[in-house]
């Protein structure tokens, strides 16, 4: 099977919040990002359901990697500027899957739409994330 992860991915995938939450990126490009996240003790809130903040962290991770995949990484960085999410259905256990696609790709910003679904394809959360594209200093 051919990897759907870019060559540069392994250099940036070794630390940070995605590792802590168990987020696994399956496909990364400037036109689509797919990732999964477990619903377990790391990602549930005290009442036993998927924490909304974990869903938002998954959504921003997807948007961030998509934005980074579409820019000149030598000259620019992509940083989260705004994110929102609507939590549609609770999730108690298992895995959620996020698919992100760009809605707008501009010179200084990108807007990504991310749908997070359960194993049956039912919508758990929908999010929109704006990424600022900033020149490296």
Go through each PLM region and give its residues.
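Terminal targeting signals and extreme-terminal segments of soluble enzymes
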Residues: 1-137
């Amino acid at each position: 099977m051919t990897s759907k992860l870019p060559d540069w991915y392994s250099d940036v995938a070794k630390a940070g919040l995605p590792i802590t939450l168990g987020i696994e990126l399956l496909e990364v490009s400037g036109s689509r990002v797919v990732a999964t996240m477990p619903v377990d003790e790391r990602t549930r809130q005290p009442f036993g359901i998927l924490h909304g903040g974990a869903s938002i962290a998954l959504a921003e991770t997807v948007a961030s990697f998509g934005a980074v995949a579409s820019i000149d990484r030598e000259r620019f960085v992509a940083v989260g500027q705004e994110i929102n999410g609507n939590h549609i259905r609770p999730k108690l256990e298992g895995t959620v899957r996020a698919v992100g696609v760009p809605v707008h790709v501009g010179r200084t910003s990108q807007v990504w739409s991310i749908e997070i679904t359960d194993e049956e394809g039912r919508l758990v959360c929908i999010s929109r994330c704006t990424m600022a594209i900033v020149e490296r200093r």
